[in-house]
Amino acid sequence: MLIRIITFLLILNISSINLHAAQFIPPQVGDYLVAKISSDSNDYSTTKRYYQRLHRSNPNDLLALDRLLLLSILDGDLLSANNYSFKLAKAGCDKNVNSCCMNNQSPQGHLVNGISYLNSYKPGFADQSFASIWRGNLSDSTFVRLLRAWVWADSNTIDKSMALIDLISTGEHQHLTLVHKALIYDYADEIELAEVFYDQSLSVQRDLYVLRLYYNFLHRNNLTEKKDAFADEFLSSYDEEFQNKFLTSNKNRIIQNPLQGIGVVLFNSQLLIEDLNEELAHMLYQLAIDTSPNLHEIKYIFASFLNQLENHDKAREVLSYIPKKHYLGNFAAIQISDAYSYEGNNEKAIQNLNTFVEVDDSFEAYLSLGNYHRYEKNWSDAIDNYDHALKLGKKFDKENIWEVYFNIGIVHERSKNWKLAEKNLKRSLKLSEDQADVLNYLGYSYIDMDQNISEAKVMIEQAMELKPNDPYIVDSLAWYYFKVGKYNEALSLLEFSLDMMPYDPTVNDHYGDVLWKLGNELEARFYWQKAIDLDQENIFEDKVKIKLLKGI
């Protein structure tokens, strides 16, 4: 009877809740968990759908609104972000009062509101929104003042803009304050003042994106003398191919309105704001490319960041917006292929670069294309692309032409043509004698073939001086000691390499050899078997299997 009464009361209570609180359906824990898991895996669309479900269940859920605001930004949906931002500000407010509960608003909400107001030509509201970013994860006085300065970046209000920048402490982010003074004066057509501040900023630091903006300024304003001297003064360390692409431009402004100037501040925020987490850094990059679409350097840096987060699909999408003829175009194409490669899809990486070189004869693209063919053991195709790279490298006097000869040497060594391999490896060293990887590769090859042992040791020691504690080079030196019968010396070095690279098949194979020579036969067989298990390319499986049966 007691159980029946309790059951009846529970049913009555639940019915009452459903009748009187239809507007509130408690969110399920599972919704939060799925949203969290999707967010961690960069699946922002799925995450957004689950938070939208939570929001429908409880429109005043501040957590759901704040997450929807951020996720909309990450998804590149500024319109929705702005909508959620205003909902967040008004959540729980008295609808009869024409006000917002601004305490609900997050720093990213104020940021999005400011961008929206500026885009709607409401500078006063934009300034107020940016000025409200004084707390939370985006709190930085220089960041806020630069945002506000761009709100007033107009010939009629430029004094107000400069007054805000002048509030930034002397020496604190000096370079960026000079850059933004130059950009704002440039936008306001104060040519002489812009020129002064460009010169001052470049005397402190020479970032490529600032150089690009400065050259655009010189080109637009027909400052011929400085424009003609630009390459010698600022690009002398770059090769001719890079210079040609950099200097090929039209006279269109890169920063065409204050909102695009805000994009540069958002790009700079990574240097200004301390302890940014990955999500907020991602948000700021996304807002930067949305607000300043003409500054392609932001896209390139953002894509590198996305690849580090293993968000390769979005990285490729961002890179695809960089024009192929831009000075970063070939590097963007290579990074797109790298993103495919990170996913284990070298075939797509090759297809992408093949398409690119039809449009642009690029040394870097052909070199990268040769590398991908080498990874796939397409020896003939690798050599063909390296030959293209060599022609372009000689034409433009590329400093890293040694790298092409090095890779050609690797192809010939792997395809059992040692004479050509040795010739190209030596040619590489002749062009650049302090290349640790080339010294190590040639030295190790000599040792493995029992040739030029003393010369090989000198090469490996030189490599070790250039790259101390590199586990591959340490392994090569250990292999030298093994070959000359100094097994204890070899053992201590291999233990270091094994700690650094426990999953490298060559190191495990070498470690097994040394253990066998020192009488630890059972343990040696364990490491030989491990080498076979780790050898995905089956380079020396048969050789190691013989050792498992017979020893050495």
Q: Would you name each region that the model predicts?
A:
Residues L19-Y84, C93-Q108, H173, Y238, ...:
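N-terminal leader/linker segments that initiate helical-solenoid repeat arrays
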Residues A64, G109, V144, T177, ...:
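TPR alpha-solenoid repeat register
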Residues S39, I73, L118, A153, ...:
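Position-specific recognition of the canonical hydrophobic site in helix A of tetratricopeptide repeat
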Residues S57, K90-D94, M102-N103, G136-N137, ...:
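Structural marker of alpha-solenoid helical repeat scaffolds
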